[in-house]
Swiss-Prot record:
General remark: There are two types of hair/microfibrillar keratin, I (acidic) and II (neutral to basic).
GO CC annotations, alphabetized: intermediate filament
Domain IF rod: 1-23
Keywords recorded for this protein, A-Z: Coiled coil, Intermediate filament, Keratin
Family: Belongs to the intermediate filament family.
Record protein name field: Keratin
Domain of life: Eukaryota
Region (Coil 2): 1-23
Amino acid sequence: YSSQLAQVQGLIGNVESQLAEIR
């Protein structure tokens, strides 16, 4: 379960970094 949570956090971080690039 913890590994799945880490995957979700990594995915969110990736999306946030992409949004930062757009801005």
